[in-house]
Amino acid sequence: SQKELIKMRTKTGKPGPLVDLRVVDENYKDVVRDNKSTGEIIARAPWLTNGYIKDKEASKELWKGGYLHTGDVGYIDDTGSLIITDRIKDIIKSGGEWISSLQIEDIVSKCKGVKEVAAIGIKDVKWGERPIIIVAKIARENTEDINKRIRERISNEIKKGALSKWAMPDKIEYVKEIEKTSVGKINKKLLREKYKFINTNEK
């Protein structure tokens, strides 16, 4: 079907000959291949870079454990294809699970009234991190209505098993514009710094 064809084309693909590709958890153990459990993507192959020029420490970290650490998060599906879901620096680690900020953003962006969205993880004593969502809304839309749509849509994805139960945001913040980098990307580093002291207990 057209839907299956689109889904196939969005995959990164299968590793080629001589490529040893793994998806691992924080203890460098391979994650279960269940089409939803994600981990860090690491690889080794004869043609991969040996490291950084004049930076032995960074090179050592890059090849920690004998594999090149790509900095990407994803999973290998039941066909053996790699699907990248996020960057490891942007992943939200909550309740012992890795939650894709991009997946949350994709879901929320489809809600009526949302012009732009960013999902970030804020440090939490109990759960490690908790997700919060920053939304730039369409001017005429009511924030309470948008909140309801966002939580309902995320709840539906959780019920379907497409999202972890820990993905429900503790807080939704509204701004006129979401901060960008010099190349026009959402500046999540700045957002994490800006909202690091936010009280997630206040919904």
Language model region names:
Residues 1-82, 88-91, 104-105:
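Conserved AMP-binding/adenylate-forming
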